Amino acid sequence: MASRIAKDVTELIGNTPLVYLNNVAEGCVGRVAAKLEMMEPCSSVKDRIGFSMISDAEKKGLIKPGESVLIEPTSGNTGVGLAFTAAAKGYKLIITMPASMSTERRIILLAFGVELVLTDPAKGMKGAIAKAEEILAKTPNGYMLQQFENPANPKIHYETTGPEIWKGTGGKIDGFVSGIGTGGTITGAGKYLKEQNANVKLYGVEPVESAILSGGKPGPHKIQGIGAGFIPSVLNVDLIDEVVQVSSDESIDMARQLALKEGLLVGISSGAAAAAAIKLAQRPENAGKLFVAIFPSFGERYLSTVLFDATRKEAEAMTFEA
């Protein structure tokens, strides 16, 4: 009997399950399934690209464990994806991150031994990128992975996420719904799905408050991980059939409903993807169609955010019963 023990934690990445949404999708004429990326080793879809970008740079001879210092600007989850891979492979990692991101993300990054530099939240991801470039310029053997520009980002989704969805749905997928942060997921997985069936539609999700892809202006919003305020070079906008806008409030409410009605504790961007997919599945022309939405991350990473404000206050105010 062959051993099924993984060589290290990076071998556990991928092959996440798909599950139908039932109660929150009541009244829909189409069906909605979620790809549960919270089941990754470090609980987010970014585990895939963290591993992919480091491995790709290693194969190209651009970095070496124990010598190279990896640097990356991130809103949090990519940092975690890079952090556990860097720890397993023996790299020092410096992360720049807007100070508005959740406390959990800071703690997790520090737990993995990351050197964390917080940046002005008013400057968003652009501020984090500028700080990372400044650090890179003065760091010997520094190497920036650049998730917004690195082809290894969409490549891993083309090689793994897309095929997993195609196989998991038995090729019966009609629409793929993905929030757009770097654009790597929708570009890579979407390209693969369209190659299998040109009729598969790709739906990008962005915040109403920062609807860049729809021709709007960048603005502050509460959906951590999507709506970066610019169009990343990794994103192939030509692949996208439609951009669906959802508000921060809609996304937060849906994330809460997913916990209460589906037993799925997810982050705010999962709420955004679900809200968008349900809107699509409610359209009469989509009767009988199957939409797969990416749920990027686990809700436990958002306990200190607006998502769990009321719950946290209730929990903190509780006293024991005699």
From Swiss-Prot:
One of its GO terms (molecular function) is mRNA binding. Changing residue 147 to A/E: Strong reduction of cysteine synthase activity. The modification Phosphoserine is found at residue 178. GO terms for cellular component: apoplast; chloroplast; chloroplast stroma; cytosol; nucleus; peroxisome; plant-type vacuole; plasma membrane. Changing residue 217 to A: Impaired interaction with SAT1. Changing residue 269 to A: Strong reduction of cysteine synthase activity. It is found in: Cytoplasm. The keyword Amino-acid biosynthesis applies. Changing residue 78 to A/S: Reduction of cysteine synthase activity. Disruption phenotype: No visible phenotype but displays lower levels of thiols in roots and leaves, and also an affected sulfur balance. Also shows an increased sensitivity to cadmium stress. Homodimer. Interacts with SAT1. Component of the cysteine synthase complex (CSC) composed of two OAS-TL dimers and one SAT hexamer. Interacts with SULTR1;2. This is Cysteine synthase 1. It comes from Arabidopsis thaliana. The lineage of its organism: Eukaryota, Viridiplantae, Streptophyta, Embryophyta, Tracheophyta.
